[in-house]
Every structure is written in C-alpha cells, then in structure tokens.
Amino acid sequence: MLKIYKTSTVEKKTKKVKKMTTDCWIDLIVPTTDEIDKVATRTGVDKNLILKLLDTDELPRVEQEDNATLIVIDIPYLEEKAEHKYKTYPLGIIITNNNYIITVSVKKTTMLNDFKRNIVKDFRTAKKTRFLIQILLKSASSYLKALKEVNNDIEAKEKVLKKSTENKDLV
C-alpha cells in the first residue's frame, strides 16, 4: 500500500495527497512491485534498498547511500494469540537528498497514525530531521508501553504462583 502525505505550509495540517512532490512523506506498507518501482523512479532511491526493508529479519542500523540516508529501527507490536505476545518488526526510514522521506514497513503500524491524524505537535513533512526524531520518540514510547504491560503480566503471574501451593500449578 502506497500513501503520500504532505503538510500544507498555510494550514500547517498534514493531508493525504495523490502526487509525490518534494517535501512529502511516502508511506509504504507491504508495497507491491509496481508501488516500489513508482517510488524508486520518482525519488531516485534504489528499489533494492526498499526491497531489503521488506525482510522481517532486517537489523536496525544507519547507512549512508549515494543519494539517501537509511535508518532501520525495530518497533514493537502486540500479537495476542502468539506464545510470545510482544514482537518487533523493522521500520525503514529513507531520507533522500532531494527532499523526500519514505517509511517502509512489513506490517500496518498504528505507531505512525498520530502523524497522519495531525496529533503530533509541530509535525511537518518538510522537516525531515524533526520527523525522524519524532518517529524515534514514538518508537521509544511504544516500547515503554509494551514494557509496562509485560511488567503487569509478570506481577499477575507472580501473584498466582504465590498463592499456589501445589507443584502441578508451578508447571
């Protein structure tokens, strides 16, 4: 899925737009080959760079490419029905030299929704460094929320174990 956002300089509101223009944010969520080709052609980013970001095992890092900077972070998500509820997946952030910012993810993330809904204070698609820092802050907040939930789960299980007197309950 390809979505494009741009902050209006007059209204200072971020809106979904149809065309990729400078100072826009291109959000790719499990993109098709056609969407990757379209973004690569318009922005000048190597499509193999985007394709690499679709690997769920991609490691966090920062790389300087010919015409872009790549930042890969892991962001947490909750998978209720899995054995381990909390998992992470990579979010790729590409900041191009020709004023585009591209986010690439292998799953639909709620973490970026506040940017799309104009909830994040002082968010501007033209302010690439600020946007990056705001994404990192949102990611850190997501980890703190997940950590709090893990701690609550641990405390609840410790209470159950404390009340338990039979060995079968300990297994």
Predicted regions and their residues:
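Membrane-cytosol interface segments
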Residues: M1-T96, Y100-I101, V106-M111
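Extended amphipathic alpha-helical scaffolding segments in membrane-proximal extra-membrane regions
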Residues: D74-L78, K85-V171
